[in-house]
Regions:
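Hydrophobic face of amphipathic alpha-helices that form TPR/SEL1-like repeat modules
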Residues: 47-53, 65, 69, 80-87, ...
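Terminal, low-structured helical/coil segments at or just beyond the last alpha-helical repeat
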Residues: 5, 11-15, 20, 149-184
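Positively charged n-region of N-terminal signal peptides that target proteins for export
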Residues: 25, 29-32
Length: 184
């Protein structure tokens, strides 16, 4: 005779309703919740350690610290790797890779990376040509995200733009803003 899962008492996961199973299940849940809460702090500690390494000019070690977090989608790590490629810190300077890493981070709402994307579009380095519409777009998004320097960059770029370009940029800003900053 098969015992229904609701009455099963073999794994201590609290499935059967017995007190000892519920207590063991509660302990497992507490461990899970604790790890869930601590995981971001561990990632933050790794990022801060990488920043410290960068300040000590230990760029290769910093890259080793950042790489797993960046590959897992951490926007701070992605932005720092973008900085490293943009400036040739511990890696050969590569504007295309720098832009790609900045863009990954920017699409997750990282204001510093958004300014980096704006700068690359403004200058056109590593890109086929400058694109003032997209430069302005990313500077505005960066300012919305809280980068205090982005407003200055935005003011400089808008001086070089036509009314038509500004209008197109505002269309893009409206498109991105809803997605990147749904509560602002």
């Amino acid at each position: 005779m098969e015992i229904p899962v609701s009455q099963w008492c073999g794994q201590g996961r609290g499935l059967c309703g017995h007190r000892h199973c519920q207590e063991e299940g509660d302990q497992e849940m507490k461990k899970f919740v604790l790890m869930f809460c601590l995981w971001p702090m561990l990632a933050l500690a790794e990022i801060e350690h990488a920043r410290d390494l960068m300040e000590e000019n230990r760029f290769e070690e910093a890259m080793q610290e950042l790489w797993p977090a960046a590959r897992s989608g951490n926007a701070d790590a992605e932005e720092l790797i973008g900085v490293m490629y943009a400036m040739g810190l511990g890696v050969e300077r590569d504007d295309v890779r720098a832009f790609e890493w900045y863009l990954r981070s920017a699409m997750k709402g990282h204001p510093g990376a958004q300014s980096g994307v704006g700068w690359y579009y403004e200058i056109g380095r590593g890109l086929p040509a400058p694109d003032l519409v997209r430069a302005y777009t990313w500077y505005v998004l960066s300012a919305i995200g809280g980068d205090p320097d982005a407003a200055i960059s935005q003011e400089e770029v808008v001086k070089k733009m036509t009314a038509e370009q500004i209008e197109k940029a505002h269309e893009l800003i409206d498109d991105y803003r809803v997605w990147l900053f749904p509560f602002r």
